[in-house]
């Protein structure tokens, strides 16, 4: 595949056979959160070397420790967060880390607070573990989504034990500021609550915004947080199954040690090796990708303003996901169905992100810019035919 992102074609992407381009044949894939830009050369080189060695058995302790050290170095360099290597644990993915957090770090049966719209599995995983999800819709202030602190406070008062915090936020693209997180922490601490902080999109932040790990803010946040992250979104590795659970206090580390054998089962050798290479050698590739995505998020705004001005859009501060307000189109609560059927463009239905997502759609713009332009053209033409 071409290393010039503009030169990658729809035919190239379909030939790869990835989920985004194979699940709905003949369409433009702008739904599932994976990118169309291949992978960083240091990552693929590390994978080839591991395959050539035949490293297909159980995860070696030394390989897991290398990844922990790599992430700790990345966190220190990029975020100024000094995390002890022993507190970075190898996991299969963010959802596995959430399952461990709910099962072993909250009171049995306690509900989970979820600001919505939200990453879709956050709505479905807690109920599979016997936990109620209390949706607290985000508020919009001055054109930006913010947390409803009164709603979060009320949910904790009603017996919830855990707040799921997603930063950078999927799907709305907010990158929380320190003051916002300090206010959230005050509410959590007042109720003796816990926070699960999903920071998988942290490397994908645009100029003018800075990622601050929630657990790094204060001793208070460190004491009540388990953080989950991975190189999988920023370096396009979701199928390789590796992530990091980051513990930020001694009590959690001791508790984690009691369940680690089960909790950490599933992190794959190749995924761990790929994460290590990404954190240690993937910076230049990531910088090029983020610069390209920055152009895409701006171009998406221009295209929508020109072709479909009825769709509301605010360029995200992080992630490669555009949150499209389609309510003015008067096409119902599930606009993605129209765009898939009549435009041949597959988006993620906002309803899947919770009740607050009705009438919205999530657009993955991590694609070649000519394909992005083609997608919006097809959407506009479909609406014009109605």
Predicted feature residues:
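N-terminal small-domain helix-loop-helix segment of the aminotransferase-like
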Residues: 2-93, 100, 280-281, 386
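Conserved glycine-rich beta-strand-loop-beta hairpin in the small C-terminal domain of fold type I
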Residues: 276, 293-301, 313-326
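Conserved core segment of the aminotransferase class I/II
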Residues: 219, 223-294, 383
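Conserved core of the PLP fold type I
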Residues: 56-186, 203-204, 211-216, 220, ...
């Amino acid at each position: 595949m071409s290393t010039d992102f503009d030169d990658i074609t729809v035919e190239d992407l379909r030939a790869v056979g990835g989920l985004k381009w194979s699940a709905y044949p003949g369409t433009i894939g702008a739904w599932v959160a994976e990118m169309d830009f291949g992978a960083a050369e240091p990552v693929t080189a590390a994978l080839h070397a591991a395959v050539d060695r035949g490293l297909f058995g159980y995860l070696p302790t030394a390989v897991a420790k290398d990844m922990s050290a790599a992430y700790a170095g990345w966190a220190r360099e990029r975020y100024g967060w000094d995390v002890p290597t022993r507190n970075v644990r190898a996991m299969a993915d963010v959802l596995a880390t959430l399952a461990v957090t709910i099962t072993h770090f909250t009171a049995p049966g306690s509900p989970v607070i979820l600001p919505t719209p939200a990453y879709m599995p956050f709505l479905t995983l807690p109920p599979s573990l016997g936990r109620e999800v209390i949706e607290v819709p985000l508020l919009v202030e001055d054109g930006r989504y913010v947390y409803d602190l009164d709603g979060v406070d009320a949910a904790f008062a009603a017996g919830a034990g855990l707040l799921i915090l997603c930063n950078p936020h999927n799907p709305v693209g907010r990158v929380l500021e320190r003051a916002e997180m300090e206010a959230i922490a005050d509410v959590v601490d007042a109720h003796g609550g816990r926070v699960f902080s999903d920071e998988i999109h942290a490397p994908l932040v645009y100029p003018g915004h800075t990622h601050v790990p929630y657990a790094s803010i204060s001793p208070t946040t460190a004491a009540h947080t388990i953080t989950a992250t991975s190189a999988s979104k920023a370096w396009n590795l979701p199928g390789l199954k590796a992530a990091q659970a980051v513990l930020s206090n001694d009590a959690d580390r001791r508790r984690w040690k009691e369940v680690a054998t089960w909790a950490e089962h599933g992190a794959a050798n190749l995924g761990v090796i790929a994460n290590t290479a990404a954190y240690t050698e993937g910076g230049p590739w990531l910088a090029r990708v983020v610069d390209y995505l920055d152009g895409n998020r701006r171009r998406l705004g221009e295209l929508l303003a020109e072709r479909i001005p009825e769709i509301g859009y605010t360029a995200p501060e992080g992630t490669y996901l555009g949150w499209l307000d389609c309510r003015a189109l008067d096409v119902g609560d599930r606009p993605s169905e129209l765009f898939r059927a009549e435009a041949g463009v597959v988006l993620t239905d906002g309803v899947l992100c919770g009740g607050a997502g009705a009438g919205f759609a999530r657009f993955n713009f991590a694609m070649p810019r000519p394909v992005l332009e083609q997608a919006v053209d097809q959407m506009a033409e479909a609406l014009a035919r109605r």
